[in-house]
Regions:
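Short acidic-glycine-tyrosine-enriched beta hairpin
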Residues: 1, 109-128
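Hydrophobic, well-ordered secondary-structure elements that form the walls
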Residues: 80, 103, 119, 139
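A generic structural signal for well-ordered coil/turn residues at beta-strand boundaries
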Residues: 8, 71-76, 94, 118, ...
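Glycine- and acidic-residue-biased ligand/ion/polar-headgroup-sensing regions
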Residues: 8, 82-110
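C-terminal amphipathic alpha-helical segment
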Residues: 22-95
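Conserved hydrophobic/aromatic beta-strand scaffold that supports enzyme active sites
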Residues: 2, 11-13, 77-79, 97, ...
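Ligand-binding loop in jelly-roll beta-barrel domains
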Residues: 2-20, 126-145
């Protein structure tokens, strides 16, 4: 994925992990020895898929609901505009990842409250089947399809 991230942006890059990084530009940053880091322009250009893809779509923004943004064979990503309490009943077939992209929320499970703020990410094991989300936040919910 080619990306440039500026101040104030939140990017959720949901993908399979990879040990490969190609740098197209690195703002002349230096490594620990004071050398500029290696660029990989030719390799990066060879790896880019240049086909135009029209994937823009509007999605629902129902309060306290899991609104599907991406649903593909590998994973599902939902947007939750949380404004109070949302009870969650997990199928137990996949872990769930929550990313707080705005505001703050609490996750209540088995009488224990865990608190999360903007920028926090939490991995919920598949065995945690019933819990509550409370607060005022914008949350991404990701799980394996």
């Amino acid at each position: 994925t080619v990306h440039a991230i500026g101040a104030g942006l939140v990017v959720a890059e949901i993908q399979q992990t990879s040990d490969i990084t190609y740098r197209l530009y690195d703002f002349d940053r230096k490594d620990a020895q004071g050398n500029t880091r290696e660029l990989h322009v030719d390799l990066a250009l060879d790896a880019i898929n240049y086909k135009k893809v029209n994937t823009y779509k509007k999605y629902s923004r129902e309060i306290n609901q899991s609104n599907t943004v991406v649903d593909c064979p590998y994973f599902t990503t939902n947007f939750i505009p949380l404004e109070n309490v949302k009870g969650v009943e997990n199928s137990g077939l996949s872990f769930v990842v929550y990313m707080c992209i705005e505001g703050s929320f609490e996750l209540e499970y088995d009488g224990i409250i865990y608190k999360y703020i903007k920028g926090d990410t939490v991995l919920i094991p598949a065995a945690m089947k019933s819990y509550n989300l409370k607060g005022k936040a914008s949350i991404l919910e990701i799980y394996i399809s």
